[in-house]
Amino acid sequence: MLPLPSELQIQAQSIKQRFSELPAPPDLRDEDIAVLALSDFVSDMLLIHPQWLEELHQQPPQPQEWQYYSQWLSQALAGVQDEAALLTALRLFRRRVMVRIAWSQVLQTSGTAETLQQLSTLAESMIIAARDWLYQVCCRELGTPCNRQGVPQPLLILGMGKLGGGELNFSSDIDLIFAYPENGQTQGGRRELDNAQFFTRLGQRLIKALDQHTIDGFVYRVDMRLRPFGDSGPLVLSFAALEDYYQEQGRDWERYAMVKARLMGGADDPYSQELRQMLRPFVFRRYIDFSVIQSLRNMKGMIAREVRRRGLKDNIKLGAGGIREIEFITQVFQLIRGGREPRLQERALLPTLQAVAELGLLPEQQVADLSGSYLFLRRLENLLQAIADEQTQTLPNDPLNQARLAWGMGYADWAAMSTALENHMQAVRVVFDDLIGDETPDIGEDPSHGLYKSLWQDVLEESDLAPLTPHLEEAARRQLLATISGFRHDVDKRTIGPRGREVLDQLMPRLFAEVCSRPDANVALSRLILLLLSIVTRTTYLELLVEYHAALKHVIRLCSASPMVASQLARYPLLLDELLDPQSLYQPLAPSAYRDELRQYLLRVPEDDEEQQLEALRQFKQAQQLRIAAGDITEALPVMKVSDHLTYLAEAIIDAVIQQAWNQMVARYGQPSHLQQSEGRGFAVIGYGKLGGWELGYSSDLDLVFLLDCPLDVMTDGDRSIDGRQFYLRLAQRIMHLFSTRTSSGILYEVDARLRPSGEAGMLVSTIEAFADYQRNEAWTWEHQALVRARIVYGSPKLHQQFDAIRQQILCRHREDPQLQQEVREMREKMRNHLGSKQRDIFDIKADAGGITDIEFIAQYLVLRYAASEPRLTRWSDNVRIFESMAHYDIMSPEEAAALTRAYVTMRDEIHHLALQEQSSKVAADSFIAEREQVAASWHKWLAANDANVS
């Protein structure tokens, strides 16, 4: 054993003092002191439970003792009579065994592979013991779940990730998926329950038993987000539902996750075998699948962006050459060739690497390097986490914890340990780059950039600039020199360090080479400098622009085209990561993919870290809006598609925000008890205005109205039970809070809930009955106009159907046309007086006569006027399809409908482009003359005061 360094000797003296104050002070051996000095967790536990130290002396930890964990746990649970006692027993058992594992790990009586086995077996034993105990309790309370033949149905649990691979780290969450074989009902209970309801309740109680924090701590943080549909999906699925999902909707990343999936309990019963056989074809393809490399490259890019986003430094899991890259290297071979090579279907990493060597897929020396680096990094990770039983992979920067890790790894000091770590991670990085690394090569030093070095490093005269910018006028050259000089002066006032200065000196000649040849060089450079000033002290982003020349070109192109994009990049430099893949940059996601992409994005953030979740939502929105704007700028997306994408993006975010708010509320109060017998959550959100009409712009707010479906006498089923309707009110308030909270990435959306019944004076959440009553008996005509553009954007199927029926019923009312005309016209005049430009030389595209609002009012008037005789006119909430319907049902001529649509789309397109230029919707008075004449003619035809009824 190495002698303890000075930092640990000081720690040892403190520990001796604390143990000497116990009622029966133990005799501490040298090895005891070494372990206690390395781990606050172990010393804290042994001070609380000094008898465990005596047990360590009498029965020292053995490498293979994991084989007895289940037996020991059965003894610990033998006297447990209720759930509270179960929670206590599980937590004490976990602490006791984790102390033994940490002890064995520090003293190296167990190797790293054996430690990983111990940690994984402990978790599996506790999951299975808790499941089996709770299954019996649930069967007594609810009846036994059976299939249609009366055969009892079990709960099967897939352990994912490191748990599935038998490689769990010291302080880890556990990723689980719950499944049951067949649908059916419970038998023997007071009343029948569907199997889905039984297993959902069992699953909820199991998660609580493992995850809930009590005075004794917790057992494991349980993460269920890898299940089909993530948080928004059922907690437990039948085999048939699982199979349908993975066959029809399984994503690449779910396939990779399933490589390590393992049934907990090692069961070989027919149901377990059936589930394994069902999943195997999804994971391992029969053909050689080289698409894996690009998919894994994309995943690695996502992780690299995550490292930058969270400012992670010295991260031995996610950093270059870290644990994750070794896992990716191994998975490449498993996923490409695993379908044909059974030896590659191992869940554990080290045996898979051995198979890679035996199959000649990598040189033996590289496999040896990877295996050695993996064991080194995993031991370091476990020692790091054992210090305080905390889930971290970031190396410490304080001397005490550095000394702990250096000694635990067998090095004299931190410097020696750091050198060894760097060598291991570099060896991994070499293999990773060869196999998976980025396709974009560094461009090297372009000789032409030498011409521009003097422009950055020397003080040039205007005449010196002429050869570099022959196309610019003298005034433009003077402006360019002044801009560069000002930027240089600003940089000199910043503390950027020698590395930052070196990278900036590489970047600026490259940037000038691209910018100076442009006709809009001054505009481009002034916008780029705003970005550069925001990142000049963040070397990571400067390096990104140096290393990826394509990214630099995209930055210049987008900033030149749009000050909105330039200011977004300057405010949120994380968005620069989006420029690395031009294919995705100019090609936004498929509209149906936003929900799944956001789900993947949020999976990388701890579920219980609200601040990180809020940041991630905002960053996802900004990244996707950048991609949409890039498609808009390059005209890859027409105006209608821009709004469609912005609307689908908003809906995905609404879904995720409600999910987060729901989880937080249920954790605090439980869920309303009536949901146990119903489908969905008894909650819905109506989108009004631009959201309802599929017309969102880049800075649009969201007009939302909240509905609930909850009987009066319902309470929530949590420990802090509250009235069910109060629960939904607080849920809506929480949703509003999550949208509006300002983080370092800004707010998510401005949300306006004033279109609810009775406006600001009304309840934030309405029952569906109250909403219907208000619309029938109290709503003004303008509120019925708003209803034309309303649709459900989130909600249970029942509420969705009820709202659609109410909306159609209200819109299909018979209305007296002269009165309807007058009320629509008066509301329009009121808006025009309030919002119009009132300047002769200005035309406000939105608010002035002949503009977009007139077109919207014409569409709304026509629906309210004619839906009574043709209910199908209420189907759509967007103007374009409303006009199509008017032509289809012979209410409006096809020529007029097409002309109004053209006018509407043309003006909407201009508003989008003005937004990209950070300009308002006010333009010169002679703009859109033809379109305004068409709108005015249609307004006069349908809504002018002196017209007779037109039918």
Swiss-Prot record:
<dbReference type="GO" id="GO:0005524">
    <property type="term" value="F:ATP binding"/>
</dbReference>
<feature type="region of interest" description="Adenylyl transferase">
    <location>
        <begin position="449"/>
        <end position="951"/>
    </location>
</feature>
<dbReference type="Pfam" id="PF03710">
    <property type="entry name" value="GlnE"/>
</dbReference>
<dbReference type="InterPro" id="IPR013546">
    <property type="entry name" value="PII_UdlTrfase/GS_AdlTrfase"/>
</dbReference>
<keyword id="KW-0547">Nucleotide-binding</keyword>
<keyword id="KW-0548">Nucleotidyltransferase</keyword>
<dbReference type="GO" id="GO:0000287">
    <property type="term" value="F:magnesium ion binding"/>
</dbReference>
<comment type="similarity">
    <text>Belongs to the GlnE family.</text>
</comment>
<comment type="function">
    <text>Involved in the regulation of glutamine synthetase GlnA, a key enzyme in the process to assimilate ammonia. When cellular nitrogen levels are high, the C-terminal adenylyl transferase (AT) inactivates GlnA by covalent transfer of an adenylyl group from ATP to specific tyrosine residue of GlnA, thus reducing its activity. Conversely, when nitrogen levels are low, the N-terminal adenylyl removase (AR) activates GlnA by removing the adenylyl group by phosphorolysis, increasing its activity.</text>
</comment>
<feature type="region of interest" description="Adenylyl removase">
    <location>
        <begin position="1"/>
        <end position="440"/>
    </location>
</feature>
<dbReference type="InterPro" id="IPR023057">
    <property type="entry name" value="GlnE"/>
</dbReference>
<dbReference type="GO" id="GO:0005829">
    <property type="term" value="C:cytosol"/>
</dbReference>
<dbReference type="InterPro" id="IPR043519">
    <property type="entry name" value="NT_sf"/>
</dbReference>
<keyword id="KW-0808">Transferase</keyword>
<dbReference type="InterPro" id="IPR005190">
    <property type="entry name" value="GlnE_rpt_dom"/>
</dbReference>
<protein>
    <recommendedName>
        <fullName>Bifunctional glutamine synthetase adenylyltransferase/adenylyl-removing enzyme</fullName>
        <ecNumber>2.7.7.89</ecNumber>
        <ecNumber>2.7.7.42</ecNumber>
    </recommendedName>
</protein>
<keyword id="KW-0511">Multifunctional enzyme</keyword>
<keyword id="KW-0067">ATP-binding</keyword>
<dbReference type="GO" id="GO:0000820">
    <property type="term" value="P:regulation of glutamine family amino acid metabolic process"/>
</dbReference>
<keyword id="KW-0460">Magnesium</keyword>
<dbReference type="GO" id="GO:0008882">
    <property type="term" value="F:[glutamate-ammonia-ligase] adenylyltransferase activity"/>
</dbReference>
<dbReference type="GO" id="GO:0047388">
    <property type="term" value="F:[glutamine synthetase]-adenylyl-L-tyrosine phosphorylase activity"/>
</dbReference>
<dbReference type="Pfam" id="PF08335">
    <property type="entry name" value="GlnD_UR_UTase"/>
</dbReference>
